[in-house]
Amino acid sequence: GGICVLPQGSDYDAFFEDTMHAGHYENRRESVDIMIRSSRSVINDLLAMGVDFERKTDGSLDFTREGAHSRPRIAFHADITGKEITTKLLQAVRKLDNVQILEHVAMTDILTGERDGATVCTGVVAVSVDEDNSVRPADELANAAEDVHVGEPFKIHARHTLWATGGIGGVYDHSTNYPQLTGDACYIAQEHGIK
């Protein structure tokens, strides 16, 4: 696997057609256009974070052809592009002083409240799923009231909540996605009327 990128401007029309065709022409044309036009800046950002995409002997990116693509336009790292990207992104996030990472924690619901006459998300309900360690200290779990035991829900309050929910590939019998990608956040959003 890898990431589709517009290797040169002259490839735009073919890239657009390949993407529309792969999506059975049900894709939002505007979204496809944005994806293609922003692809190079996304790759440049990842390169700046240290992602090690494969390169040709002259140092330029090496592209491969996959799936519905009619030309080589996939930036990749061996056969573990996703791992390479997530490893480098996690390293970058761990350097941020204003970010707390809660590992082995899953969101089970959201907290809502009123702000300026509107219902807003004020945090999440989560559960520790770390089976190797039955108790996680409260200070590691964003102001939980006491020690949190595996399977016990706890609340995380926030002024602003951003959902980076992943995909839904894990709900299908045949998928190359991680089985943990079950779309739980999509369900929770639907239950709360979030669009």
Where are these regions (language model features)?
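Conserved N-terminal/central alpha/beta ligand/cofactor-binding core
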Residues: 1-122, 127-147, 164, 168-171
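Residues at the start of alpha-helices and the adjacent loop-to-helix junctions
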Residues: 31-34, 150, 177, 181
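Glycine-rich phosphate/diphosphate-binding loops that line cofactor/substrate pockets in enzymes
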Residues: 95-98, 155-159
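Short, mixed charged/polar active-site loops
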Residues: 135, 150-155
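Glycine-rich loop(s) and the adjacent beta-strand/alpha-helix scaffold that form part
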Residues: 160-195
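Conserved structured core elements
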Residues: 40, 83, 155-156, 179-183
